[in-house]
């Protein structure tokens, strides 16, 4: 008996592309609906992305959490990203979850982002950061220039469609990635300092 073909899923959340953005954060694919604590990127309450942002910009890991709820405040997050000029865009538009979970290891990519079309909407964007290895691999494939895979925390030149961009590979904020919250926040802080979006700590 043949097994049923695995479902091709479409990314449920659109990119957030502030026209004045100077930085774009790019990940892969969100968890299934039952693991989402809000309707926006990095929605799993066990994922530390928005705790990292809270620490970096407000010195408060709970800044983007809903009071007394195990959920993040999507509208507060979006307003902050728009105000600071930070875009959030997936590298993957369609994919198959080979094991039915959010693991990049078992994510079969069907369709990737049209990076040129995305960047065309943000003429001032100069810095791209990825939130894990898979997103980094996808962007290097799209760029097609033989750039060596950067190590976690490393920044490399990323020339694309006539623009001199940088690409920084940041650690995954998934709890499955073996790095504590403070060290993840330090890596993201270093990136945002480099991009001029937060002041260096003395």
Place the predicted regions along the sequence by residue:
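Structural motif
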Residues: 22-23, 127
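Short, conserved, surface-exposed binding loops centered on an aromatic residue
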Residues: 16, 78-81, 121
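Active-site catalytic pocket residues across diverse enzymes, especially alpha/beta-hydrolases
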Residues: 57, 142-143
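Internal catalytic-core helix/loop-beta-alpha segment
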Residues: 83-142
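N-terminal nucleotide-binding beta1-loop-alpha1 segment
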Residues: 25-28
């Amino acid at each position: 008996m043949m097994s049923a073909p695995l479902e091709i899923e479409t990314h449920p959340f659109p990119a957030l592309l502030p026209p004045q953005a100077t930085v774009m954060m790019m990940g892969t694919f969100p968890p299934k609906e039952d693991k989402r604590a809000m309707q926006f990127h990095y929605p799993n309450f066990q994922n530390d992305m928005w705790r990292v942002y809270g620490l970096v910009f407000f010195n408060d890991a709970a800044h983007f959490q809903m009071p007394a709820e195990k959920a993040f405040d999507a509208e507060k997050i979006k307003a902050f990203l728009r105000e600071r000029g930070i875009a959030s865009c997936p590298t993957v538009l369609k994919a198959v979850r080979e094991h039915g979970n959010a693991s990049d290891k078992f994510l079969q990519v069907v369709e990737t982002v049209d990076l040129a079309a995305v960047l065309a909407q943000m003429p001032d964007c100069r810095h791209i950061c990825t939130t894990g290895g898979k997103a980094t691999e996808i962007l290097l494939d799209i760029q097609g220039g033989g750039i060596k895979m950067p190590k976690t925390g490393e920044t490399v030149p990323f020339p694309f469609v006539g623009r001199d961009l940088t690409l920084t590979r940041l650690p995954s904020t998934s709890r499955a990635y073996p790095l504590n919250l403070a060290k993840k926040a330090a890596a993201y802080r270093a990136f945002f300092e480099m991009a001029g979006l937060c002041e260096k700590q003395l």
